[in-house]
């Protein structure tokens, strides 16, 4: 275990409140991105879509993309971005919220922030188990990242609650 995700309430791409409790009992993959990113974010979003497809028959898997640029990434902007990447709204959510809440999640909880810039972030994904425990990180620049995540998701699903 690499950490525990604390309770949070943010705003989803549909403008509705999204609580971490909605992920209880689910295995989920998290990433941090921003919609105007010209670096790794588009590739990461393609990989999240690949995960969505690879896990489409696994009912208790969710994907969560947290913006690091809430000033730009409003729910409407996130909704358009989600459509661009063909996100299944039931399984892949895009979240925004107060900058301090997103910063706390990125830096303190997931440790997926890079030091040195306002909009810098890691290109790693985090795997979270059904109890909200961070179980693994994945380097998305690796060609084996998606198959490894799917394999680990299947292992986590076999664990007792």
Describe each PLM feature range.
Residues 1-11, 156-161:
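N-terminal targeting signals for export/organelle localization
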Residues 5-6, 28, 122-124:
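Short loop/turn microsegments at loop-to-beta-strand junctions
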Residues 8-28, 52-55:
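A short beta-strand-turn-helix
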Residues 18-48:
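Short active-site neighborhood of thiol/selenol oxidoreductases, capturing the structured segment around
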Residues 31-33, 65, 127:
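Structural cue for short, hydrophobic secondary-structure segments
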Residues 43-105:
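Structural microenvironment flanking redox-active thiols in thiol-disulfide oxidoreductases
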Residues 116-161:
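Thiol-/selenol-based redox modules, centered on thioredoxin-like
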């Amino acid at each position: 275990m690499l950490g525990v995700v604390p309770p949070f309430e943010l705003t989803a791409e549909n403008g509705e409140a999204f609580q971490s409790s909605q992920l209880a009992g689910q295995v989920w993959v998290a990433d941090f991105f921003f919609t105007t990113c010209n670096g790794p974010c588009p590739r990461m979003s393609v990989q999240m879509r690949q995960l969505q497809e690879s896990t489409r028959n696994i009912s208790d898997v969710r994907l969560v993309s947290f913006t690091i640029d809430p000033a730009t990434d409003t729910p409407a902007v996130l909704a358009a971005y989600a459509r661009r990447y063909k996100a299944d709204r039931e399984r892949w959510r895009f979240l925004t919220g107060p900058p301090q809440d997103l910063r706390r999640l990125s830096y303190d909880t997931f440790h997926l922030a890079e030091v040195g810039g306002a909009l810098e972030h890691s290109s790693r994904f985090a795997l979270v188990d059904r109890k909200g425990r961070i179980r693994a990180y994945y380097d998305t620049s690796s060609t084996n990242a998606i198959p490894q995540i799917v394999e680990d998701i299947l292992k986590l699903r076999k664990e007792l609650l």
